[in-house]
């Protein structure tokens, strides 16, 4: 048919070897480029996400050039195996300004970026909710499993990162996360390594709602806890639900961390179930003398279980360190 005709002409034109490459590229495009000035494949990130085929078995990279993208970005549940890579963490910015006080919107619809698909990686970009200080305003809302965030910045105030799905596994490496109150919250299992957690107000860093049957909630390893000038009274966490699990291991605490360390959310019952743990932390705020009695100081033996393999349950087919 006519298809063969075109193909034959291509062979004459290209030579045989390149034809195979050409036809393969026609079938799949591995990299989509997003740029504000129209020189890429798309001008906004949502369009690029919508161009990705459902449930792919190969990885597509969406490369986002420097610029400010004012978008409410949704990665739907049928999109998987996608990497969103910015040109630079400082200058590739996804931003929006919804907050919970707009038309009774509620916290859970205020996100700038919502990730419902599995096996999604974000790298070298900023996700921001810039709704000023107007109630809960989520920058990142995750529902997917096996999500990775590498060298990203998360800017917001209250409720910056909502890890919304029980049993979902998330990895944050070398990220900067700032906020005011409960700025990392939810039921998912998440490992944060080499991250900076920056408190903009006297408040609480985490509000985990880990289910009772899940061993690991939030685990922070080798992270740095910093604060804005004048911020002096910050708690490591308070339990959004009973059985909240949060651990800080080999982290550096500024002097803004309160001696008590943890808060019961004005409910003494939470003290019986909360799974709060610390080990090997340094800095002014890491002194354990004043810590609440119901938080655990791990032994050298106990801390050994906090490996990526255990946290992410390697047998369940995902292990980002391979």
Over which residues does each language-model region extend?
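Short, small-residue-biased leader/transition segments that mark boundaries at the very start
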Residues: 1-6
